[in-house]
Amino acid sequence: LGYTIAQNLYVSPKNLLVEGISDLVYLNHFSAVLKQMGREGLSEDVTIVPVGGADKIATFISLMRGNELSTVCLLDTFTDQSAEARLKKMVEKKIIVDKNIIYYHSVLEKNFADIEDMFTKDEYLTLYNGTFGTCIKNDDINTDKPIMSQLKRLNNNKSFNHYAPANYMAKNIGTLTFSEETLSYFEKLFIVINNKF
């Protein structure tokens, strides 16, 4: 764990902790796109720190406390009860304040969401199908439910590499377009994040 942390730990006075590299890729891309349009992206003085999973969030917060660093967490809805319990304990001990924990589901005003739910379903399916050579259609997906759990179900309940579609997006950015709905979700997210620092 110490080695993983040392590899990932590039910090600045203002740090946004996210679960993985895919969060970093999506957030950086949409921040740049929105700024080019004259809209709000992530503040330049905020560093995105991918920690390698929800289970490592609490460890990173512990490492950063006491260093006069401002830390905000941006998380998928918890599915790991132990990671959620560790974070709640840190809030109780005032190691991090509850208002500095942002969940994608709160920005999207849903009960459950991952970063992939910031996209319209058809846009994320374009990334997924392009990555894995599949032909999943919008009709195969329930628009009211989180997309990742549905894709896992359609993949015989096997997990898949969440970074791969983000990497596909980065490599094919010139041929991809995203809707105003998706851009608005990301802009709303950046406004929420920027207001926390």
Task: Show where each model-derived region lies.
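RecA-like P-loop NTPase motor core
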Residues: 1-80
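Generic structural motif recognizing short loop/turn segments at the entrances and edges of beta-strands
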Residues: 44-47, 97-101, 174
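Generic recognition of stable, solvent-exposed alpha-helical segments in well-folded globular domains
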Residues: 22-25, 59, 110, 114, ...
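Terminal low-complexity/disordered tails
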Residues: 150-152, 159-197
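Activity-critical C-terminal alpha-helical subdomain
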Residues: 77-164, 168
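Generic structural signal for hydrophobic core residues of well-folded globular domains
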Residues: 30, 122-123, 127, 131, ...
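Short amphipathic alpha-helical segments and helix-helix/interface helices
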Residues: 61-62, 87-91, 190
